[in-house]
Curated annotation (Swiss-Prot):
Coiled coil: 241-495, 646-915, 1003-1060, 1111-1140, 1256-1335
Spans annotated as Disordered: 932-956, 1053-1074, 1340-1363, 1376-1420
Compartment list: Cell projection, Cilium, Flagellum
Keyword Glycosyltransferase: no
Comp. bias regions, Basic and acidic residues: 1053-1071, 1340-1352, 1395-1405
Domain FHA: 18-69
Listed InterPro entries: CC-FHA_domain, FHA_dom, SMAD_FHA_dom_sf
Function noted in UniProt: Regulator of sperm motility and spermatocyte meiosis.
Tissues and organs where the protein is expressed, per its UniProt entry: Highly expressed in the testis (at protein level).
Name of the molecule in the record: Forkhead-associated domain-containing protein 1
GO CC annotation: sperm flagellum
Entry's Gene Ontology BP terms: apoptotic process; cell differentiation; meiotic cell cycle; spermatogenesis
Deleted gene: phenotype: Mice do not show any abnormal changes in fertility or testicular morphology. Exhibit reduced sperm motility and higher spermatocyte apoptosis rates during the first wave of meiotic division.
Amino acid sequence: MKAYLKSADGFFVLNKSTTIGKHADSDLVLQSADIDNHHALIEFNEAEGTFVLQDFNSRNGTFVNECHIQNVAVKLIPGDILRFGSAGMTYELVIENPSPVSCPWVRGPAPWPSPQPHLSSSPPDMPFHHGIQPATVQRSWSQGCPRPTMVPPAPHQRPMSASGKMFSFVMDPKSPVINQVWANAMDMSEQCMMDGLSGTIPPTEIFMDHDLSQQDKDEIILLLGREVNRLSDFEMESKYKDALIMNLQAEVADLSQRLSETAAVAAARQSNRCDPKLQGVDEGDDLRQKEIESMKSQINALQKGYSQVLSQTLAERNTEIESLKNEGENLKRDHAITSGMVTSLQKDMSARNEQVQQLQEEVNRLRIENREKEYQLEALSSRCSVMKEELRKEEAQKDRREAQEKELKLCRSQMQDMEKEVRKLREELKKNYMGQNIISKTLREKNKVEEKLQEDSRRKLLQLQEMGNRENLIKINLERAVGQLENFRNQVIKATFGKTKPFRDKPITDQQLIEKIIQVTEDNLSFQQRKWTLQRETHLHPKQEETMHSVEKLRVLLDKCQACMRDSCSSIDLKKEVELLQHLPLSPLVSGLQKTVVNILRVSLSWLEETEQLLGDLDIELSDSDKGFSLCLIYLLEHYKKIMSQSQDLQAQMNASRETQKSLRQEHLAEKEKLAEKLEQEEKLKAKIQQLTEEKAALEESIGQEKSRSEEALEKAQARVRELENHLASQKEALENSVAQEKRKMREMLEAERRKAQDLENQLTQQKEISENNTYEKLKMRDTLEKEKRKIQDLENRLTKQKEEIELKEQKENVLNNKLKDALVMVEDAQQMKTTESQRAETLALKLKETLAELETTKTKMILTDDRLKLQQQSMKALQDERESQKHGFEEEISEYKEQIKQHSQTIVSLEERLCQVTQYYQKIEGEITTLKNNDTGPKEEASQDLTAGPPLDSGDKEIACDHLIDDLLMAQKEILSQQEIIMKLRTDLGEAHSRMSDLRGELSEKQKMELERQVALVRQQSGELSMLKAKVAQTTGLMEKKDRELKVLREALRASQEKPRPHLSTEQKPRTLSQKCDISLQIEPAHPDSFSSFQEEQSFSDLGVKCKGSRHEETIQRQRKALSELRTRVRELEKANSCNHKDHVNESFLELRTLRMEKNVQKILLDAKPDLTTLARVEIRPPQNSPFNSGSTLVMEKSVKTDAGEALELSEKLYTDMIKTLGSLMNIKDMSSHTSLKHLSPKEREKVNHLRQKDLDLVFDKITQLKTRLQRKEELLKGYEQELEQLRHSKVSVQMYQTQVAKLEDDVHKEAEEKALLKEALERTEQQLSQERRFNRVFKQQKDRGEDPEQRNMSYSPFKDNEKQRRLFVEMVKSKMQNSSVQAGAKKATLKTGQERETKKEAYKSTQSLSFVKPGGKN
């Protein structure tokens, strides 16, 4: 009993004991990471006849039917799936002849007896080797059906394992459906014998036993029988198809016979019906008979063609079937030959397999013997040293080994030869397999061909059915046509003969009908001719008399008019005569002449009236004697000469006025320069006012200190204060009133000037933006207008071209009409000449074809041109409407702009007036200052007397002034905030206005553009004037600053003159020197100890911090706030601690200096961070002039003062260095060198450091300007890109318009092509109809010549009348053809897109019928 392990790589033969592992000595070597060196062992148990698998306690264990096993022995059954390790290959146990005792559930089905050829037999006893799939018979020989009912039953309990443990493995109870594997009679290929071999197995792994058993032979015979049955099925199918084809051929023949019979019956009926009509020469019946004959011929041709095609296809199918039969027989023969070859090859293979197995057994025996001999040699080698005789034995053994090795080499060479032969056999098998595949493909192709033939036969049957349906329809149409003809004939008889029949017994023939119609038409013609002659005779006599009388009247009046025109007459005389001419009662023939003469006279009358009006307008009175057109012209010439002389005088006056204007302009410029100087003075006054406000703010702190001092002084010396109170009160009131008035005036002026400046700046910005927008809009409008002009020019060119084409077409139509007239004349001449009728008729027909075609083309083109003209007119109207609407909109906008410009001019005028007022006010102030200077020398003595009373007075004044200034500052800040809100609102309004203006771009006309350009020029002039005014204002501010400096110098001189005679001057020199050294500039921020002042300072600093740029501006703001809070806390502590008067005074003076220094440092830092920020005002802070200073100050206080000053300097410098570092890091400036502190430096070094800091500031300014320029460039680039985008959008719109126009033109071209095709078809039809008419005319002529005598013809009617009738009928025919052709063209236009050609054919057929009904009247 042989067993195998089946895997994807092939088959492995199991020995009685097979070792599995990674080691090289193991039987089945598996080299993977999951497998141990000695993994497992499979042994055959002869007692039970089963295989047992034992795991050697491997790391990952083994899996039997996906059940994990480790250090356990398990019995195996055929079909068990094994896997060694967790991720190894799967193996299936396959046993050739399982023992029935040990494994009753694996028992296969009993072999089928011989008389059952169609059922599967028992599994064969074929020996398997590497590469063979050991499957059961149900797998190898099945044909797509599931296994029989004798497959293994439901799951069962496995027997006990070798180690005494029980393991149950579940089998799949469902029998799998096995696919068809058999392809040929051979059992050796990969698909014919095994169903489990993978596609990757090479064919070199197939081996067979030497002798086949009887079962195998029976199975092969059964398979061959199945193939024979399959081929017989194919034969039956082919016979069935042959029978079907024969039946179809018979049906086709029957159908063809029926068709021929029906056609013969229809022809007989039509001949029976048409015999009496042919005797009466009915042209319509002849046409129908011809059409029916043509249809018959077409049907016969189709039948013949169809029968021929059927016969050809049947013959081809017969030949194909015969060839297929022959091929099937050849295949059977080849199959028999190949089956014999396969059996012989199988026998050879089995014999060679047995030889190989014998050789393998011998090799195994030799291996065992070699092992035994090796053991013996080892024993001998141990004894070798002792006995020399054993050496001889070893030599003999060596000789034997060499002989054995030679034998092994021979065996190996034989094995190689056998393998080569096996490969050759496999190649032959492959070739046979390929041939069988080719044969199967050919069979499939033949099946496909048969299916196609069946489909063709079905299609042809359907076509035959359609042909039958068409014949039925044709029959129905013929019957309807016959009925319509009969009805039409009856109606004609009723119309000609009336209700009573002339021959009651006999039917009316066609000849009688035709003769009656001819008589009726002749009577009508004669009657109409008589009518015309009588009417002409009656109308001619009275008309001639009337015309003669009216002509005489006209002549008389015209002579009068001529006499009047020759004489010098006025317009009134001419008018009277024209009215007489107009109201003359004349005949209608002469009325046209009358109208033309009246029009000519009216033109001359209008000229005369206009000249008289001109003379009347010029106040030139004409006398009664002076009349006539020539005299009026002479008067006009004289007046013109007078006017020319007056115009020359006026030009001289204009030149003089221009010179005066130039002088006035120069004066105006001089006045403007004066105004500029005044503005400079105003600016100086502003600076002075700012200095005063700063002084007040600086003195507020000293005022608070002086309050406390004054209270102490009042307690000590109340008597002195009571005496001086009255004097102080009077002085206070006077000073307060004067200061309050000055403050109010200055505030109002400052506010007015600020507002003016802001308004001017806003107006300038608005005007600049408006001008930019206007220029941009103008450019856009120019582009759009140019495009519209081009379009209009294109349209005009097209219109002119179309007009030219229309004129050409009209000329062609006139030519064609002339040709038609000529053709009619030629027809009348041709009718007189009977011999040349046929030739001339043909020439006329050709000419008529050409004329008809040209007329139709011209008509269609005229219609198209009319439509286009209408569309263009509509588009032009729409464009005009749009332009008018745009004009109205632009006019409204222009009026708005004009109003704005007027408002701006009014504001400028008002500003100039205010400037004049301000200059006058400043002049008054200058006068007061000069008076004060003159009066300085006088009150020096009074000042020396009032020294004692001075300090308290000054302190009270300062307190009041500081309170007023604080209130003013608060009010100014509130007003500034409100103005900022207004400015933001105005900016939003400006943005909305810009958006509206951008919407209106591209909609302006040329006139509006011109107006906008004028307005832009005006705006530019105004902006230039404003810039000039600003320059003048700047000059005035410069002058004002100079005057402020002079005032400061004068005030210092006054103070010095007042302070010289005071006794305590020596004591006050030290703080003064200190204050003079620290001349500090800072913003107006009152250093009041109250909470309101601190809040105001914090708010101003926070505003500055928001404005400053950089990533670390918040940190700097926080640092500044902390420093200010520390300073304030220290100031308050010092104020509380120091109670003594002298100490208080010293500390307060020093604190003032320290706070001023700290604020100066803070201000410098803020200026470094944001130098563009505008400061409200700068003041010089000086120590209080009248504060008492004690000479007995101690050294301790001086030390404390020095330490405080050093701390303040350190804080300020830290803030400065931090700010410089942040700016340098943000701006990427590496050359910042002013990082040293000023604490321990000498004055010279401090100057150097200050110089370096200024350089750093210049670098920062340069960097900021560079960034600004870059931003401006980027903005300009963005604007350019936006303009390009808008241009692209406009170009896209124009491209879309052009595309639509191109599409329209293409549609027009297609329409013209379709119309040409329709016209060609109509021409072809008319040609056919004309040829038919010629034939009918010839037949009629022959019949008349045969049936009628020449005498009767001369008696019945004259040839001249016949010619007239023929001519009229011919014209009617031409008209009817034209109408029908136009109807057909319309119908084809509607149906060409849908592709329905049948309707057009039917219409053509109907048109021919209508023409045939008209034709009988036109016989010769």
